[in-house]
Amino acid sequence: MPIDVLPRGARRLFAVALAVLLTLPAAAQDRGSQRERFRSAYAAVSRTPPGDWKKLATGLEDYPLYPYLEATVLRRGITKATRADIESFLTRWPGSLPENDVRETYLRELARRGDWTQFRAFWKSSRDRDLQCDNLRARLAAGEKLDFAADIDPIWTNPRTLPAACDPVLAAARGNGSLTDARVWNRLLDAAAAGNTESAAAAASMLSGPDREAADRIVAAVSNPAATLAKAEQWPDEPRVRDAVAYGLARYARRDSTSAETLWAKLGSRFKWDDAQKNRVLNALAVYRSTSYSPDALARLKALPPEAEDDASREWHVRIALAGGDWKETLAALDDLSALQQKDSRWRYLRARVLTKLDRKNEAAPIFADVAHEASFHGFLAADWIDEPYAICPRTLAADPAVEKAVASQSDLARAFEFQTLGMLPEARREWDFAMRKLDDPAKRLAADLAYRRGWYDRAVFFYSADPETQRLYEQRFPLALETHVKREASGAGIDPAWAYAIIRAESAWMTDAHSHADAYGLMQLLPGVAKHMAQSEKLPYNRPSDLFDPTLNVELGTRYLGRMADRYDGSPWLASAAYNAGEAPVGRWLDARATLDPDFFIETIPYKETREYVGRVLAFSVIYDWRMNGKALALSARMPRIGQAYAAPSDATPRKGVVCPAETAATVAPDPSTTVPPAAPAH
């Protein structure tokens, strides 16, 4: 239709749209130029000494990340910064993360100087524990009397080790009697129970005389139980001494249950235990004898006094009975679970499975039907047992252009997305977290969807998975990113693309720069040694660990490694997943001990909690990704061949199960009309 025959309103809209479109290339070019100049200017301010960043930053004043240039200069030169310098910056960038960074850096400098008057003038509530304690010091310096419950207890009861900045505050509380010996002992014993020896030692240092000696003994017993408790037969039979032995033995059982058991045989009759002390030791021995599947594990668990039982001991009673194939004992152990535990789909599914083993299928069927309403590992397995479709009920996020525009223009999010575009992901995540703290729930949902649509998948995955209201947004929670690449590489490695996707999702949640404490890198969390070996054997380019942050290379190496892992276990994806997480040596030990178990029972008896949950998570994710790609999903039970049975990856022609939404039809998550979004910051 020619433009001149359009209605007047439509012609006006068309003209505006055309004008916007005509400016887009120039705007994109200008933003691209700004990004390059920002990189150069940011590199200059990060050097020692800083380069001529102002010349490089000319014309960047309206660029979202510009305040970071000034903030970096101020923070690096904070010892020479004047109050006027700081106030000028804070005034021009109010409420922003750069403003917060500069303020907190200046507060640390003022605390270092002991300038508590200035500190109080610049103070704003902070999440930083050092600064929280510095603020309490500033209040003390001003002559304020602190209230322990309101001011100090939130810091004191935090189980993490307290920073040195808190020492003067705690010393003052000890001096005025508000930090009592009882409070010190409570913190010390809580830390000892958690194995936090640093916090326990810090608490012990506040005591004196016999209390200090007793506290030091507890810290030593928890830190090095073998060496410390070797002398325990010569210790006096006193309450705090018994505490030291009990806490030490509980810790020792975690490390070496056999040696702890031998020591308990010597010390059990040596001291006059109270019930709490004795139960602590008995519980630890029973649980950790169970995690190693010791022959006496079941007897120890059954001998526990009711007051010595906890959720962990009750769960291990189920696993030990399950591993032994004692179905009646397993059912009795399931009956002994707490009311809250019995609501968990894991234990409801296992109850139904054990009932089938006892030929009580009529009792099992309604339990399977109930569990099958969940889109989870046990829910999918339950659906297979009663031959029902999977309960996958997808939702979509309703569009609201006005709210979306407001969210997209929110200045903190604008900086987050700009950092993401530049590939500066740690900085992007800091801005993202800062921005999300300001938004209400509906606005957060739209922000996460915006991140998804901009290819920042991990933000959507983390947010929607943590929010019960949005866990059915499967498109955002299970992105089909790099689809052509993942499918090609997985097929080339002889594995199911849905399984490869599930491993990526479980390992990194699509955080391309993920780097674990175990030194694993990237989407599929590859160790540098594994990556180097795979690259050499597959003739792929690899020079350094940071190369693994390249998602395409990571997938190429990871799928090949996963394929080789599967080959070691007859193609079995569930066993290969266990080895991918825990290593081949532990899986070998478990197979030697329990290879005759059904796959679902074997998974439940995996000793490592992380691996046990990881395998179930990967298998459930495989179903969801298969459904996302094909509209149907290979039965989960088909992905779980018995140990020793050969398994072949499914093809497009492999029969798959349908999905249903039994409770309701697919729904839409509607935006809240009351959604509030902080306004964009004024231009500078």
Protein language model features and the residues they cover:
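Inward-facing hydrophobic residues that define packing positions of alpha-helical scaffold repeats
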Residues: 53-57, 86-90, 119-123, 149-156, ...
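Structural motif corresponding to the intra-repeat A-B loop/turn of tetratricopeptide repeats
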Residues: 47, 76, 80, 109, ...
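Alpha-helical adaptor scaffolds
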Residues: 73-75, 90-91, 103-108, 281-294, ...
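Bacterial N-terminal signal peptides
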Residues: 12-23
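Generic helix N-cap/helix-start motif at coil->alpha-helix transitions
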Residues: 29-37, 49, 61-68, 81, ...
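Catalytic glycan-binding domains that act on GlcNAc-containing polysaccharides
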Residues: 66, 71, 269, 273, ...
